[in-house]
Amino acid sequence: MSLKLHNTLGNKKEEFIPIHEGKAGVYGCGPTVYDYAHIGNLRTYVFQDILVKTLRFLGYDVTHVMNITDVGHLTDDEDSGEDKMVKSAEERGKSVLEIAEFYTKAFFNDTERLNIERPGIVCKATEHINEMIELIKRIEANGHTYMAGGNLYYDISTFPKYGELANINLEDLKAGARIEIDKNKRNPHDFVLWFTKSKFENQALVWDSPWGRGYPGWHIECSAMSMKYLGEQIDIHKGGIDHIRVHHTNEIAQSEGATGKKWVNYWLHNEFLVMNKGKMSKSAGSFIILEDVINKGFSALDYRFLLLGGHYRSQLTFSWEAMETAKNGRKNLNNRVAKWLDGLSDSEIMEYAALTENLNLKSAKDMIKNEKARSCFDNFIAAMEDDLSTPKALSELQLLIKEKDIPQKDVLTVLAAMDSILGIKLIEESFNTLKDKGSIEIDESEILKLIEERASAKLDKNYKLADEIRDKLKGMGIILEDQAGKTTWKKL
């Protein structure tokens, strides 16, 4: 099987075929750092992390780029409202740069606790103004812009494909326009590439440009920075569904308006995290941050586990009851995994934990010898290759740890491979469970059943299976002694 992803552009599942064989260029919209990320925002970054981990595990050389918006994002995506950074700075009595630095650190503190791998390239908008200006010049040279009221606008009527991503056309946009009117715009859905002081007198960060001293519109930064680090055509662009209608639609128009080439091959979007009152929203004041979750007695990994239980393209309802279920589910999972660790030395356990960082599809297949273990592993990979189906993948994980006749080393190798993608620190957290309990309680009936199965295997001269059962019991902390045709057991 091969990796298939649901492409928003075309609204169908497609086989992933990279531009350059064996490589994957991935761009994701990062946070606007004017406040803490709420847990709905963080769902996007867990999804992006799962995507990147899956690509890497499948053997792709991934270049992962994410922006940090620290200038130019208004409270409404359609160029209206206040500047989010300026508003936050004024409310808190800080400078815009102080606000950006504080909330950028807070964001990465949250992602670290969620075991989200930091993208290889993190780029700030304020550090790429020259790239934005140069890209705007190309867009202007191709006849897609006009000046009005001191600002440079993108004229969407010059780009016939406008709205294709969101499956809307220009006539629908005109008929359904319900946004704040900007009298400078020829079309309500035209958007600003470069603001001057005509928009905000109090803008804290401004730069010289061919169109006057000012600052960039929000959309241009993603086009400019993705092209700098990934080239003019990229494999995958990811983000939340709230970006489809405006931000990502505008990114396509300006990128392809500059280059004349298709910009992104695969668009991936995750659904909202919702509460009983609707979607989580900072502007509406209805949001929860990760610190709130932790202060309620949950861990960040409990929240990650909750997210894995839902497909990224399905809405997921958040509640404290759901968090309690996720917490108990992860606890039970760790207890079961800990049973497979019992009997190993600390160094042996840490070797398996280290495998999580080092395995890929090929190396894992080479290491997994047992047929049942291989089957669980293959089914897990099939689930992830089917548009990142984490609910199905978790089901395969649960089936694996319930098996009783797979050698310990194969189970732990498969667990390490699975966790290379899931990122819930299975072996490390289960090791902590083992240390906290001193030893895992052993089900005596299970031991006796395995001893009987081993005896039957020996009678059938299936010595390989008999040895595997002995090894499994040893992994559970049980030593067998064969004397005078009778087998006894004791704890290590």
Swiss-Prot record:
Family affiliation: Belongs to the class-I aminoacyl-tRNA synthetase family.
Any Pfam family matching the protein: tRNA-synt_1e
Record HAMAP family: Cys_tRNA_synth
Keywords, comma-separated and alphabetical: Aminoacyl-tRNA synthetase, ATP-binding, Cytoplasm, Ligase, Metal-binding, Nucleotide-binding, Protein biosynthesis, Zinc
Name the record gives this protein: Cysteine--tRNA ligase
Subunit description: Monomer.
PANTHER family: CYSTEINE--TRNA LIGASE, CYTOPLASMIC, CYSTEINYL-TRNA SYNTHETASE
Motif ('HIGH' region): 31-41
Location, primary (coarse class): cytoplasm
Motif segment ('KMSKS' region): 279-283
Catalytic activity: tRNA(Cys) + L-cysteine + ATP = L-cysteinyl-tRNA(Cys) + AMP + diphosphate
Cellular component aspect of the GO annotation: cytosol
UniProt GO MF annotations: ATP binding; cysteine-tRNA ligase activity; zinc ion binding
One Gene Ontology term from the biological process aspect of the record: cysteinyl-tRNA aminoacylation
Record-listed E.C. numbers: 6.1.1.16
Co-factor(s): Zn(2+)
Cofactor remark from the record: Binds 1 zinc ion per subunit.
Keyword Zinc among record annotations: yes
Binding positions for Zn(2+) per the UniProt entry: 29, 222, 247, 251
